[in-house]
Amino acid sequence: MRILHYINSLKVGNLLSDYILQLTSEQKEYAEVKSLTSTDDFQKVAEKENPDIIHIHACWDYLAAKRAQWAVKKGYAVVLSTHWGLNEPIRSNEQRIRKFIKQMMYQQKTVHQVDAMLVTNEKERQMALTLGWQKRIDVIPNSLLNSSISASEMAEQTILYYNKVLDTRYQVAMSSMENDAVYSLLHVGLARETSHNLLPSDQLLNLRSLNPAQWRRILLYSDDENIREIIDDAISRLQLNAPNIETSTIQRFALVLPKERNPLNQKKIVGTKPLTRQRLNDNINSDETIVRTIAIMLANAHQLDRKQTLSMRHLADLYTMIKYNDYDEDRLAEVLRHMRIYRFSRRIIQLLVDKLHLEEGFRPFSPLADNGLKAIMKRNFKHRY
């Protein structure tokens, strides 16, 4: 692990400086550690070192805030320690008007944008939580002020905390190879065919080339998208040498916007779309059971898309229903047009083609790849952490 600490200045005899010096000295037992101050070329060093974690130690400082925001924009994992700077007495009594202006200009935004905060006691954590700017705040005591923890223990706990941050944002580290592996595994896990040639050789080679770190990210993603049992089944069918990782034991922060865990309702259209329900009822025959079910599932998928909670599991359920049932494809398209979700449905078919390898003979109508599809991807499948 490569760690980059930033503090405005290091001064001999200063409590914060002594804390940073002790922390970084002990962390070198576990990682590559470098410290920068305001006089260093922060951006140049960060781009050269490519750290896994950037830890900012500052509050109410414009330069530190700008550097933190730059690091966030560049995709680095950024941790912020304000060292009591957000406490009520400091905000309200010390240059109150100036701090309010700084809050509006940059401080609140910085706290909100970083991956997480690290504080040194529970009181500081509660005061920071009260502001509502950041929910991901953990406590690791300062060994200089708390005799119950040694310097080495403090360093070890911060390394574990950094790993927690990195495991929370694992999607940022996922490569196209890992994403392709997920899609291949879904295709195999959902297949009802008994053929041994479910995947072309290049996709099989991709799966057999994955290392343990890549498998770890794939399985974390499978948990978050509620497709773990499908992935596990595919691993078994393909007899892949995947590591046995119990992802439930991996420490992570809660997702900002977790996916909907419930399956797509197949009986009724949920939510506040009475006109959609009415249009379905007006244009469906009683004997068109499968057409009705698919239309309902697509309507419910449309609602989840708007809530940004559409998951890979929902796509998998649609894939199974569309591929492994007999129905009148022209009637399905007609009903979806009356329901006014036909274009959305075509985009979903495109997702099934791209992500689950839905073959041409099983597509009920032509898929649609447009800006609307990009919007669905952005709302539901782009770096959710």
PLM region descriptions:
Residues 1-39, 151-156:
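N-terminal subdomain of nucleotide-sugar transferases
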Residues 3, 53-55, 70-88, 118, ...:
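Active-site proximal beta-strand in glycosyltransferases
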Residues 45-64, 77-79, 308:
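Short N-terminal targeting/anchoring amphipathic segment
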Residues 99-116:
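Membrane-proximal helix-turn-helix segments that form the acceptor-binding/catalytic region
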Residues 125-144, 160:
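Helix-loop-beta element that forms the nucleotide-linked donor phosphate-binding surface
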Residues 144-145, 149-174:
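C-terminal alpha-helical cap of glycosyltransferases
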Residues 167-265, 269-385:
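Conserved NTP-donor binding/palm subdomain of two-metal-ion nucleotidyltransferases/polymerases, i.e.
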